[in-house]
Amino acid sequence: MRFFSYLGLLLAGLASLQGFSTDNPLEEELRCWCLYVKNCRFCWACQDGLCKNKVLKDMPPVQEHSYPMEYCMLHRQCKYITDGPIFQVECTMQTCDAIRLLNA
């Protein structure tokens, strides 16, 4: 019986991800995405070939179409690095949810 409870929770979580697009996340989700996953294209505002992070204002600008800009689009993954491990999250998964899964 417990199995079905877990299965139901898992399916409910997956259903909430349906239709989620990393092309243009909601403004209130940007902070969660971009604090931990700085390499996602939507975290950056670009003008004249230079891009500034929308959330991390103290980050230096990067060139448009550089590695951080294109990683998510090419590999369908967003990536962030901590002192030891490298965490990769599929672009279709909300970062906050992925962090909870990694820490579980």
Swiss-Prot record:
Keywords assigned: Early protein, Signal
Name of the protein: Protein MGF 110-2L
General function of this protein: Plays a role in virus cell tropism, and may be required for efficient virus replication in macrophages.
Coiled coil: none
Family label: Belongs to the asfivirus MGF 110 family.
Taxonomy, superkingdom: Viruses
Stretch forming the signal peptide: 1-19
InterPro entries for this protein: ASFV_fam_110
